[in-house]
């Protein structure tokens, strides 16, 4: 399981270090794709396979399902770590996540997310999140 929050620099070639705690669980090859909320998602090959199977089951006749599948797969890139534990984030994905010099890498259970430090701060602002509202919604879901 991926947990925690880490700050890392993004170099001029678009490379960022993946926290050592995440590397082993991700394995040698994994998938980087566009995420929601202006971030990127990283899935291990196993988790990607599970998600891929679920997405394949969506009805092609549903416009929203087609749009989501396109969004998710068109932004996907197979990745592997270099000898220094870094990945190179393609330009289109850096643009999607508004990544510049600093990245926040967080563990979110079955996936890793990469955020620009600016977007992460905005997301976590009091104006954006009400933890009481979120807690109430989770209670409605039985959590």
Curated annotation (Swiss-Prot):
Species whose genome carries this gene: Alkaliphilus oremlandii (strain OhILAs)
The processes (GO biological process) annotated in the record are: negative regulation of DNA-templated transcription initiation
Q: Which domain of life is it from?
A: Bacteria
The record's subcellular locations are:
Cytoplasm, Nucleoid
GO molecular function, a single term: DNA-binding transcription factor activity
Please report the name of this protein according to its UniProt entry: Transcriptional regulator MraZ
Q: Record keywords: DNA-binding included?
A: yes
Name the protein family: Belongs to the MraZ family.
Q: How does it assemble?
A: Forms oligomers.
Fetch the PROSITE patterns from UniProt: SPOVT_ABRB (PS51740)
Q: Where is the SpoVT-AbrB domain?
A: 5-47, 76-119
**TM region positions:** none
List keywords of the entry alphabetically. Answer: Cytoplasm, DNA-binding, Repeat, Transcription, Transcription regulation
